[in-house]
């Protein structure tokens, strides 16, 4: 029986699809501007970023498509919007670097994971270059080979 890999205690959610679809060139850490009910829902583990992406407007970065499912008990006086646009908190130089790469070099900016840092929610974003179909196949083939190699070593030790 295979063991389930445990996610780190401070990790909220991860975008596994992004590492399959893109070559990640560089990563950045960004804060998220959240409302109170969103923080409460994130603590309950109700956040997903698999369909999320990042866009730039007026020298600011925004996270689109991140889904935070509201809790029934926490948002009684507010009408929650589960897929609203959330502002990413980055330094001006980081925003300029990301914006320049996305506009000129054909890169994409994707969210990789969200995690707790002290009591703040942080989002790890990556400057990514899209993979072609043959690159994806090669990645899967290499991963399978590494897995088979490890199995072979374990059988030899037993």
UniProtKB/Swiss-Prot annotation:
- GO term, biological process aspect, one: trans-translation
Q: What is its main location?
A: cytoplasm
Show the GO MF annotations: RNA binding
InterPro entries recorded? SmpB (IPR023620), SsrA-bd_prot (IPR000037), SsrA-bd_prot_CS (IPR020081)
Q: Where is the signal peptide?
A: none
Segment Disordered: which positions?
135-158
Could you confirm whether the keyword RNA-binding appears in this record? yes
Against PROSITE patterns, the record matches this protein to: SSRP
Its annotated compartments are:
Cytoplasm
Keywords of the record: Cytoplasm, RNA-binding
For whether the record's keyword set contains Ribonucleoprotein, the answer is no
Question: Which regions form coiled coils?
Answer: none
Task: Note the SUPFAM superfamilies from the entry.
Answer: Small protein B (SmpB)
Q: Where is the composition biased (Basic and acidic residues)?
A: 141-158
Query: In UniProt terms, what function does this protein have?
Result: Required for rescue of stalled ribosomes mediated by trans-translation. Binds to transfer-messenger RNA (tmRNA), required for stable association of tmRNA with ribosomes. tmRNA and SmpB together mimic tRNA shape, replacing the anticodon stem-loop with SmpB. tmRNA is encoded by the ssrA gene; the 2 termini fold to resemble tRNA(Ala) and it encodes a 'tag peptide', a short internal open reading frame. During trans-translation Ala-aminoacylated tmRNA acts like a tRNA, entering the A-site of stalled ribosomes, displacing the stalled mRNA.
Q: Which HAMAP family match?
A: SmpB
Q: Which family does it belong to?
A: Belongs to the SmpB family.
Which PANTHER family does this chain map to? SSRA-BINDING PROTEIN, TMRNA-BINDING COMPONENT OF TRANS-TRANSLATION TAGGING COMPLEX
Q: What is this protein called?
A: SsrA-binding protein
